[in-house]
Regions:
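Bacterial N-terminal signal peptides that target proteins for export
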Residues: 3-16
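Bacterial N-terminal signal peptides
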Residues: 16-27
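Secreted/periplasmic proteins
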Residues: 33-255
Length: 255
């Protein structure tokens, strides 16, 4: 028996509607893809333990790198900065909580350099191996203002470079002013593209120290702890957005 044309069309429409319903149900049950960070020019380094340090801190007077009175890039760091980046107590220069109401500045000194500073474990001045290889591993080594400086021991490719840091939806920016923690030639972590873990095993495996201003800006849970984690990425200066991190910008080179 022949099927009337109208009945055939109705059956086709019914099948199409059923297929659409199945597709919509499958879509509704499929979880959304995880949020992806825009990659940008430089890779992201994720879930990195960040500890806190500050200009003037002396956490181990017996260790070669136990004082922040100096940095690997500035033998007079505390003087260049303007003093203790915190408060002076009977125990010396101590950190303090920071507030956005005054741009996360310290209470006892007016900084002459950027209070939004940090370190990463690559010392391109005093680590001999890092100095030799720096022009071949640092991504911006051939950029204007850097090219041709590879044998100049008074010029650091790392000092003053900008870093974007994120934690729990907050985003802040800072400049590199020292090297560490714990390691000084960790190129796989610092410049690698596969999100390598820091080589450092001290301080809960920290891969970065941040200043008290960055600690406050990012909303760290501890003033001086080892449990806060961040994501970070290098960023060119032209891409740094307005914020308190631009109130005072450090431009000095190696001292």
């Amino acid at each position: 028996m022949k099927t009337p044309a109208s009945l055939f069309v109705r059956r086709l429409n019914g099948l199409a509607a059923a297929a659409l319903a199945v597709a919509l149900a499958a879509t509704a049950c499929t979880p959304p893809p995880p949020e992806q960070k825009p990659q940008g020019k430089y890779p992201w380094h994720t879930n990195i333990v960040a500890t806190t340090f500050w200009v003037g801190e002396i956490f181990n007077p017996n260790a070669e790198d136990g004082s922040q009175v100096t940095s690997t890039y500035d033998s007079r760091w505390m003087g260049s900065y303007g003093g203790c980046d915190g408060r002076i107590t009977s125990e010396g220069c101590q950190t303090e909580a920071r507030s956005g109401s005054n741009g996360y500045a310290p209470s006892g000194v007016k900084p002459k350099e950027n209070p939004f500073y940090l370190d990463l474990p690559y010392d391109d001045i005093h680590n001999a191996a890092a100095f030799r290889e720096r022009a071949t591993v640092i991504p911006w080594a051939n950029d204007e203002g850097y090219k041709g400086q590879d044998t100049n021991s008074s010029f650091s490719y790392m000092k003053n470079r900008w870093v974007k840091i994120r934690k729990d939806g907050k985003e802040c920016y800072g400049q590199i002013q020292d090297a560490g923690p714990g390691e000084y030639q960790d190129k796989e972590y610092v410049f690698g593209t596969n999100d390598a873990r820091p080589a450092n095993k001290q301080f809960n495996g920290a891969g970065m120290d941040v200043s008290p201003a960055l600690n406050g800006c990012l909303g760290f849970g501890d003033l001086d702890g080892e449990s806060d984690k961040v994501d970070w990425q290098f960023v060119d200066q032209k891409d740094v957005p307005p914020g308190p991190w631009l109130d005072v910008v450090t431009t000095s080179q190696v001292k």
